[in-house]
């Protein structure tokens, strides 16, 4: 049922007898699908981390190079936004 390139042979009689859920499950088990999924996930995580880095760069902390966790960045951002909002009022 697997083809040489790692894809599924969707023309086989066996494949056509499978339920929709089983077809999806088998398709997701192919090396080709797993590699594509891993690549997409890696890009998503890199984008997520880049967004946190950009947000972190906007926050004033002492020392500047202090490493903050993601939750610390979010909490500090909320506090900083509140502080700036209070300054404007």
Swiss-Prot record:
Gene3D superfamilies: Helix-loop-helix DNA-binding domain. It comes from the Eukaryota. GO terms for cellular component: nucleus. Keywords: DNA-binding, Nucleus, Transcription, Transcription regulation. The keyword Cell membrane does not apply. Residues 32-84 form the bHLH domain. Residues 32-45 are annotated as: Basic motif. Residues 1-32 are annotated as: Disordered. Disruption phenotype: RNAi-mediated knockdown extends mean lifespan and reduces expression of bcat-1 by >50%. One of its GO terms (molecular function) is protein dimerization activity. Residues 46-84 are annotated as: Helix-loop-helix motif. Residues 22-32 have a biased composition (Basic residues). Transcription factor which binds the E box motif 5'-CA[TC][AG]TG-3'. Involved in modulating physiological aging, probably by regulating expression of branched-chain amino acid transferase-1, bcat-1. This is Helix-loop-helix protein 15. It comes from Caenorhabditis elegans. The gene is hlh-15.
């Amino acid at each position: 049922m697997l083809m040489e390139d790692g894809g599924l042979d969707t023309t086989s009689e066996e494949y056509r007898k499978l339920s929709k859920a089983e077809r999806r499950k088998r398709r997701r088990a192919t090396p080709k699908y797993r590699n594509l999924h891993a690549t997409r996930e890696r890009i998503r995580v890199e984008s997520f981390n880049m967004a946190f880095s950009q947000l972190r760069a906007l926050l004033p902390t002492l020392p500047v190079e202090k490493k903050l966790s993601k939750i610390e960045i979010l909490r500090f951002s909320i506090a900083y936004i509140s502080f700036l909002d209070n300054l404007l009022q």
